[in-house]
């Protein structure tokens, strides 16, 4: 049985383009069956993260808007 692990990237306090740049760097080191959990409070991330994932062929499997931040689970 395969288990899926999450790599958490907390970019709260960072503004565009830093959340996407940190995501891109994390993706370079991802292993099979790992997902990335990106936490951000950058208002532009609602557009930037899905756009980046779409361009690169990555899938956002979950997207939540919390009170003070957004959360994305990304499958690469």
Where are these regions (language model features)?
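Solvent-exposed beta-strand sheet faces enriched in polar/charged residues
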Residues: 10, 39, 63-64
């Amino acid at each position: 049985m395969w288990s899926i692990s999450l790599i958490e990237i907390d970019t709260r306090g960072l503004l565009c383009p830093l959340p996407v740049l940190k995501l891109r760097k994390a993706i370079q080191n991802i292993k099979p069956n790992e997902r990335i959990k990106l936490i951000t409070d950058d208002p532009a991330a609602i557009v930037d993260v899905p756009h980046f994932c779409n361009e690169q062929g990555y899938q956002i499997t979950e997207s939540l808007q919390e009170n003070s931040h957004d959360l994305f689970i990304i499958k690469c």
